[in-house]
């Protein structure tokens, strides 16, 4: 839904929504979540008729909970890579994309909008960058990339109870990194790393 003030202006909502893609971006300043997908129908308060979206009346705006507009606590996070897992303190950025490859039945003759959805083979890709260091975990990460050996990766966003999000991938195949020397410290950029999983 999408509500605006005053309540007499056009409000909008979608029905039958399905998530096609989730993108999680992390860097030293902020974390962001981006959701993309399709919906069966867009309804609005200006042209709503009973029965649209299976509703008899346009939905009222939900009551807002208390919000003090303060900064979300626990911005600091952790990243663990490898087997056995080792904590990395040199991550500068990460971009994780989960794509469901949804197929909508919307190409049949005479059908107005998607009739249903079918999930495809999920794709999970990871891009990340770390500062180069002369230590065993960093060397092992490079060796895993060179040998195309799957490794576990875990990202924890936040460090306070009630304000945390974790993303765990059991088998990520790292690509050989690009050496980025645009700054004073050398960064290794791993792009297009694929997470492996089970198909059922």
Predicted regions, residues:
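Signature of extracytoplasmic/envelope-associated structural regions
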Residues: 1-200
């Amino acid at each position: 839904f999408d509500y605006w003030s005053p309540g007499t202006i056009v409000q909008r909502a979608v029905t039958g929504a399905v998530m096609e893609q989730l993108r999680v971006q992390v860097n030293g300043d902020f974390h962001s979540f981006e959701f993309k997908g399709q919906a069966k129908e867009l309804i609005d308060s200006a042209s709503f008729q009973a029965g649209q979206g299976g509703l008899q009346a346009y939905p009222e705006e939900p009551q807002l909970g208390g919000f003090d507009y303060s900064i979300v606590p626990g911005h600091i996070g952790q990243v663990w890579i490898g087997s056995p897992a080792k904590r990395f303190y040199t991550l500068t950025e990460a971009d994780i994309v989960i794509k469901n490859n949804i197929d909508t039945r919307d190409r049949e003759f005479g059908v107005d909008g998607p009739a249903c959805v079918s999930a495809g083979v999920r794709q999970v890709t990871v891009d990340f960058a770390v500062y180069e260091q002369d230590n065993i975990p960093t060397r092992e990460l490079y060796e895993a990339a060179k040998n195309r050996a799957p490794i576990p990766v875990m990202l924890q966003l936040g460090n306070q109870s009630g304000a945390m999000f974790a993303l765990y991938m059991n088998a990520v195949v790292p690509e050989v990194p690009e050496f980025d020397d645009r700054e004073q410290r050398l960064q290794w950029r791993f792009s297009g790393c694929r997470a492996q999983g089970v198909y059922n």
